[in-house]
Amino acid sequence: MGASGSKKRSEHSQGLRERLLRARGGGYVKQRNASGGESSQSQEGSGREQKSPSCEGQQYQQGEFMNTPWRTPAAIGQKNSYKQQNMDDVDSDDDDLVGVPVMPRVPLREMTYKLAIDMSHFIKEKGGLEGIFYSRERHRILDLFLEKEEGIIPDWQNYTHGPGTRYPMYFGWLWKLVPVDISQEAEEVETNCLVHPAQTSRYDDEHGETLVWRFDPMLAYSYKAFILHPEEFGHKSGLPEKEWKAKLKARGIPYSE
């Protein structure tokens, strides 16, 4: 039974990368790294680099983090709007979501630390996210895919604010967002299209950076988002309210009173 379930999951997941790439263009493009050199992103995945730590799973609680669209009671309308947007995406982008069931295949459940670890490695092994340009549309596709295929409630995928590397705010999710400089050759040849994510990603981002997903297994052991930016967790940060609000204000990050 286990092998059969694993096979079915593998078959369903193989189309995730294709759906993401069809969302306004591909993700294979030359990029400039921090040292000034160029690198091309391959579409092949690899196996796990490290085993998941033996830790107790952490469950999501409403209001726990800062940038989920519905973290406060006052944002219920935003939550409903976000869910409606996911539904609209299915209607408007059917070609991008071929094979995604309308209803979840399994009962709905909250994301946990262990589940985030497992899903991160599973997606990596299938070549899912590595080097793909981030966009709001692709963010929703990933949410929708894991909701319909794995029953994971889409309230977990959140990243720290920029500029710079954006770390996942859900401990256990091993994919971070890294800003890249697109090479001139890539812009002229491969991404000479206004709707390509290499072009639109910078407009999605408030800091004007082009972001790509990168797998980082060390995020299973180090809660980078909380270590580097505790103020983004608000009351959960353990900081005095005046202090975390002052830090958010200094960084230009909005917060609810």
Swiss-Prot record:
Residues 1-10 have a biased composition (Basic residues). Residues 53-65 have a biased composition (Polar residues). It comes from the Viruses. Residues 140-156 are annotated as: Mediates dimerization. It is found in: Host cell membrane. Transmembrane segments: none annotated. Its main location: host cell. GO terms for cellular component: host cell plasma membrane; membrane. Residues 88-96 are annotated as: Acidic. A motif (PxxP) lies at residues 104-107. Residues 11-21 have a biased composition (Basic and acidic residues). Residues 1-70 are annotated as: Disordered. It is a lipid-anchor. A lipid is attached at G2 (N-myristoyl glycine). Pfam families: F-protein. One of its GO terms (molecular function) is GTP binding. Residues 35-45 have a biased composition (Low complexity). Keywords: AIDS, Host cell membrane, Host membrane, Host-virus interaction, Lipoprotein, Membrane, Myristate, Viral immunoevasion, Virulence. Belongs to the lentivirus primate group Nef protein family. Homodimer. Interacts with host CD247/TCRZ; this interaction induces down-regulation of cell surface TCR/CD3 complexes. Factor of infectivity and pathogenicity, required for optimal virus replication. Alters numerous pathways of T-lymphocyte function and down-regulates immunity surface molecules in order to evade host defense and increase viral infectivity. Alters the functionality of other immunity cells, like dendritic cells, monocytes/macrophages and NK cells. One of the earliest and most abundantly expressed viral proteins. In infected CD4(+) T-lymphocytes, down-regulates cell surface expression of CD4, CD28, CD3, and MHC-I or MHC-II molecules. The N-terminal domain is composed of the N-myristoyl glycine and of a cluster of positively charged amino acids. It is required for inner plasma membrane targeting of Nef and virion incorporation, and thereby for infectivity. This isolate is from a Gambian case of 'neuro-AIDS'. This is Protein Nef. It comes from Human immunodeficiency virus type 2 subtype A (isolate D194) (HIV-2). The gene is nef.
